[in-house]
Design a protein with these regions (language model features):
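Acidic helix N-cap motif at the loop->helix transition within catalytic regions
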Residues: 20-22, 47-55, 97, 101
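Cell-envelope/extracellular polymer assembly enzymes that use nucleotide-activated donors
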Residues: 6-9, 27, 37, 176
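A conserved acidic beta->alpha catalytic loop
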Residues: 42-51, 69, 93
Length: 191
């Protein structure tokens, strides 16, 4: 029997992301760590994206919720976090692809070191292919000087999120969330 304390809820906001969405979802499904649930909040997407999402309706580990109006990524992430019941929350965006052992490595790193907030290195793709190497440790002051924590690399203990939410602004909603979270946990650590 899988213990609830080992579960990770994965938050995925989606809006008209048909180009990479299938790859994004499959990168979660293919994780070597199997104790997860994917919570997708669709933000009033076009028919092409909705048809793609329909292919995942029957997957027992994927929950999809549909908005009737476009509210933005911050609103969608907050709604998914509200629906989350697991002790850990990870974030992925609809145009990001995880390595297959991302969750396994990250949760083991957090548990072994008793960390409540972690992030990873990441690689961009598309026009500008870069390997992003963030510092090994961030506190609030160092983060506002160097904002290199990718949202799709974050895993956090749910209990540390108390009243920490994404703003509903159309830009920088993830930056403000990370700032508020770092004030609460003091430090975040890089795997």
């Amino acid at each position: 029997m899988i213990k609830a304390k080992d579960y990770i809820d994965i938050v995925l906001p989606n809006y008209n992301s048909s180009r990479y969405l299938k790859q994004t979802i499959n990168s979660v499904i293919m994780q070597t760590y199997k104790k997860w649930q994917l919570i997708i909040i669709d933000d009033c997407s076009d028919n092409k994206t909705l048809n793609l999402l329909k292919k995942f309706h029957k997957h027992k580990k994927i929950k999809i919720y549909y908005q009737k109006k476009n509210y933005g990524a911050g609103f969608c992430r907050n709604l998914a976090m509200k629906k989350s019941k697991s002790p850990y929350i990870a974030f992925i965006d609809s145009d990001d692809i995880w390595n297959k052992n991302k969750l396994e490595k990250q949760i083991n790193f957090m548990k072994k070191n008793h960390y409540s907030f972690s992030y990873t290195y990441y690689k961009t793709f598309g026009l500008k292919k870069r390997f992003i190497t963030p510092p090994l440790r961030f506190d609030y002051k160092s983060f506002i000087k160097n904002t290199s924590i990718g949202t799709s690399t974050i895993m956090v203990e749910r209990k540390k999120l108390k009243n920490r939410k994404f703003t509903n602004s159309k830009i920088c909603e993830d930056y403000y969330f990370k700032c508020k979270l770092l004030k609460r946990v003091n430090f975040a650590f890089c795997l």
